[in-house]
Amino acid sequence: MQKSLITKWLCISCIMVIATIVIGGITRLTGSGLSIVEWRPVTGILPPFSFESWQAEFAKYKAFPEYNSVNYGITLSQFKFIYLLEFIHRLLGRITALIYIVPLIYFYFKDVIKNRDMLPYIIALWLFCVQGFMGWYMVKSGLLNSPYVSHCRLAFHLIIAVIIYHILFYQLIKNRCDILLIPSQTDLKLPLIFSGIAITVVYVQIFLGALVAGLDAGLIYNSFPLMDYSFIPMEIKDNFFDLKNWYDPVFIQFIHRLGGYSVFLVVVVLIICLLKIEHPKLNKIAYFLMIALLMQVSTGIITLLYSVPIIIASIHQLFAVILLSIIIWCCFLIKSS
């Protein structure tokens, strides 16, 4: 009974984190992230209701750079749209934190989760707190002189969310999945190594994807596989190792492409390793990996070719998390065998 409760709690928490990540991506893609110019963790749980309160929020927004530089002249109705998207993202974050924290306190005092097992849950709790501050720290970067948030802060904001999800999902499968029974003579060293490498390259690629989103780097060089008839664009050939390139949309898109190739190659090798073992469950994971990889690659290419359509770009982000989840599951099963 207790194990079932923890499983349901972790499952709901994971779903909520994914939903918050996806809505956060949509918020960025629609340029809605700077519409709420204050951080009110408690009193900000309710949106404006009256016409006067909407006018007051709109007046606050007009005092900041984004209105004057990017959205000058937008109507109140247009402002409501971007405001509500950012509001939903913040509200989801608060609800997700509560869904995680309140049951965690209950489980701890009822001794449902033992002291020896608490460390990952405490780390996730700490990261939830950090994430709230990181979200505002990111937004604040676009409320000063520039009407754009720092792409680096955006990337760290996303990565913290993914790490939280990773911890919760790992605890979920640890609580839910049975140990994999494989003959002792089976060599699992190679698939274990490549599952670890795959997790690493997917993390790096998610981080790079956030940099692309933060710099609107998906709106340039909308061709594939070449960038304006060249594998390496002319703008970065002569100064490829210059640290300033990390603020250059051309360089960031190029590195994200390289990351995509790396993810594809590593996951394909992992799939081959899993299929060679000829174990039903690992073979099933291999097929899931094929589907997730195909979806991730195809949505990434379509996102680029069609200048970042919001729905496809959001699906692309979602499948990055799904792909990571399958690899984590794979790694857990191999380690547990």
Curated annotation (Swiss-Prot):
- Report the cofactors: heme b
Q: Name one GO cellular component term.
A: plasma membrane
Sorted alphabetically, which Pfam families does this protein's record hold? COX15-CtaA (PF02628)
Q: Which GO terms describe its biological process?
A: heme A biosynthetic process
Q: Which GO terms describe its molecular function?
A: metal ion binding; oxidoreductase activity, acting on NAD(P)H, heme protein as acceptor
What keyword terms does UniProt attach to this protein?
Cell membrane, Heme biosynthesis, Iron, Membrane, Metal-binding, Oxidoreductase, Transmembrane, Transmembrane helix
Task: Specify the pathway.
Answer: Porphyrin-containing compound metabolism; heme A biosynthesis; heme A from heme O: step 1/1
Catalytic reaction equation(s): Fe(II)-heme o + 2 A + H2O = Fe(II)-heme a + 2 AH2
Q: Where are the transmembrane segments?
A: 6-26, 87-107, 119-139, 154-174, 192-212, 258-278, 285-305, 308-328
Bilayer topology annotation:
Multi-pass membrane protein
Give start-end of the signal peptide: none
- Look up keyword Glycosyltransferase and say if it applies: no
Quaternary structure? Interacts with CtaB.
UniProt name for this protein: Heme A synthase
- Please tell me the species this chain comes from: Rickettsia massiliae (strain Mtu5)
